[in-house]
Amino acid sequence: MDIAHDLQSIGAQEQALVFPHFDPARAWALGNRMHALATARGHAIAIDIVTFGQPLFYAALAGATPDNADWVRRKRNVVAHFRRSSYAIGLRMQQAGASLADKHGLPISDYSPHGGSFPLTVAGAGVIGSITASGLPQRADHEFVVEALCAELGQDYAALALARS
């Protein structure tokens, strides 16, 4: 895995995966799409979709644990703070050889810069929330969310997927 290349690719994902509008019905449709995809693949994950301050969708699939719910919360907090993918922030910290606690004073008990939370962006409004998955390895959590967003937004996932490591 090349960190610089992944960061460039994640930036392209964040630019491309923008909703024209977003409401609770769209959150429900996206959440159900993610649930069906995860179920078909046998993923034991938690799925979370929020606008900042309001939960819109949550599901814990068979095999997911309370730890997954806490990882969701901590990854979601990274997106809320930085308005960037939690994976991008984690890769930046890795590049810098620093932690969120060292560099930004953010406690690991509340912030986790691991892959799986992606900014929910609306055209003309910016980042309004996050879409998060937890239960797979961090790169796979990130790509699961991106794949679902591509399907929901009619984007070509193959063109936006991270390079295979």
From Swiss-Prot:
UniProt-listed Pfam families: HbpS-like
SUPFAM superfamilies attached to this UniProt entry: GlcG-like
PANTHER family noted in UniProt: PTHR28255, UPF0303 PROTEIN YBR137W
Family according to the record: Belongs to the UPF0303 family.
NCBIfam families tied to this protein: PRK02487.1-4, PRK02487.1-5
Protein name: UPF0303 protein Bamb_1459
